[in-house]
Amino acid sequence: MTYTKKILYADDDLDDKTWVSEATELLNYQLDIEFVENGRQVFEYLETQMEVPALIVLDLNMPELDGRQTLKKLKLNNKYKNIPVVIVTTSANKIDVEICNRLGASLYLVKPDSHSEWQLIIKQLVPYIS
């Protein structure tokens, strides 16, 4: 299945980016995913691209500008506040979940460690770009 709407995916972990790409291939999905390393790069991307992504995915633990700070900045910005933001992170901490929900995250998912579980993550992102 081909999806033309862009996903901006912020995660500094190369292994996780590989998991995302491999899970997408295993599902036979053609997704337009742009990977960046941190929140600062999210805003650099948004400020330099003509097209706003349909979805932003954030890890919480990133250098320079972490996922919480990035989410807060996005939701306070009139230009970007309506873009759905999904958190995909290693933290299952209830406080992190509550903070992200309060800041406006559309969905909070804990990173898995297998291809089949990563495929479930990808399937949960698709409704935001369909």
Regions found by a protein language model. Name each.
Residues 14-35:
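Two-component/phosphorelay signaling modules centered on CheY-like receiver
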Residues 35-55, 119:
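Acidic, metal-coordinating helix/loop segments flanking the phosphotransfer/catalytic sites
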Residues 58-59:
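Active-site residues of response regulator receiver
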Residues 62:
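Receiver (REC) domain active-site loop signature in two-component systems and cognate sites
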Residues 113-124:
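C-terminal output helix
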